[in-house]
Amino acid sequence: MNTRRWREFSRHVLLALLFIPLHACTPADDPPISLTQAYFFTESLKQIEAGGRQLQAPDLDEAGLKAALAMLDQGLRLAFQVERDGLDRLDLRLGKNYQRYFIEGVENYRLGIEAGDETQQQEGLRLLARWAEFWSQEGEAIQAKLQPD
């Protein structure tokens, strides 16, 4: 093979090698949400659920109340870091429902407890019930999309 043909052949091989990794990274192969965002989302659900369960304890004392509220606060901090567009890639309704029902529900409930405002607590519980309705139907499918293959 002469030098000119060798260079041309080498150039084609190099171009092909460049396109193989690009093809491997097509959007179809990308996860719908980053690992960090998946962590923020799932951990916010866990923290808030744990705080909610602790608030339901029949023998809740002042220390237990403070610990439960701290879990709710930590869950909300994580929830505020979740990007809506990532959630929408998992399910078109997820971002809106997460914000409107889950986050606002927890905020209302949390603030109602702190202020001793039963009406605000009830509003929070009403919103959380709407979230629970959505999550009970779609949660399993959404969580399956978050699991790495």
Show the residue positions of the predicted features.
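Bacterial N-terminal signal peptides that target proteins for export
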Residues: 2-13
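Intrinsic disorder/low-complexity segments enriched in polar/small residues
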Residues: 7-9, 84, 122
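Sec-dependent N-terminal signal peptides
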Residues: 13-20
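C-terminal motif of bacterial Sec signal peptides marking the signal peptidase cleavage site
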Residues: 22-24
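C-terminal amphipathic alpha-helix
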Residues: 29-68, 107-149
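Short, solvent-exposed, charged loop/turn and helix-capping segments
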Residues: 69-97, 143-149
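Heptad-repeat alpha-helical coiled-coil/4-helix-bundle sensor or tether segments in soluble regions
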Residues: 96-107
